A protein has these predicted regions:
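N-terminal beta-strand motif that seeds the catalytic metal site of vicinal oxygen chelate
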Residues: 1-21, 30-37, 42-45, 89-94, ...
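Vicinal oxygen chelate
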Residues: 1-2, 11, 78, 94, ...
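Core segments of cupin and vicinal oxygen chelate
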Residues: 12-62, 101, 108, 122
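Short acidic/polar mixed-charge low-complexity motifs
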Residues: 61-64, 137
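Active-site/binding-pocket entry motifs
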Residues: 64, 73-74, 147
Length: 159
């Protein structure tokens, strides 16, 4: 027996409609389906009492996101981005063709851009920056010259 494939990456959100719009309109994810989750099995699986939750699945480039919105119990936490050295999920990277133009689109939509993270690596020709989804989940945008379909690690290999 072995792991067969990646299923999805789950993100807890406070406002489903706002988050679906953000991931769809700004990041290009395509909504697939929606499910309602509740009942004793859900309570046991999620280790939460009285679960009442909506999940919307979105997909882009073979990556599926599962956005979780809890009516009960209410979501906890704040909208501050997690420190990169905090254990667990750190950030999702999206490759873009023109970082500066893409940032203008995100800013125009009210996205919080962490301007102090904007970095240019002349040796690689790359530019990077972090921004936050509507609930503070870190998203890294990167512009790398060359074939956009070359996996990130291969782009930097041997340099």
């Amino acid at each position: 027996m072995s792991v067969l494939r990646v299923g999805h990456l789950g993100i807890c959100v406070s406002d489903m409609e706002r988050s679906v719009r953000w991931y769809r309109d700004l990041c290009g994810f395509r909504p697939l389906t929606e499910v309602h989750v509740s009942g004793a099995e859900s309570d046991q699986l999620l280790r939460l009492p009285g679960v009442d939750q909506r999940t919307v699945f979105l997909e882009r480039d073979g990556l599926r996101l599962a956005l979780f919105a809890f009516a009960h119990p209410k979501p906890v936490g704040d909208r501050e981005p997690r420190p990169m050295n905090q254990l667990g999920f750190a950030a999702m990277m999206l490759r873009v063709d023109d970082l500066d133009a893409t940032l203008e689109r995100f800013r125009a939509a009210g996205t919080r851009v962490l301007d102090d993270t904007y970095t240019h690596h002349p040796g690689y020709g790359s530019k990077l920056v972090f921004l936050c989804d509507p609930d503070g989940t870190l998203i890294e945008l990167i512009e790398i010259p060359g074939d956009p379909y070359t996996p990130f690690g291969q782009t930097y290999a041997g340099r």
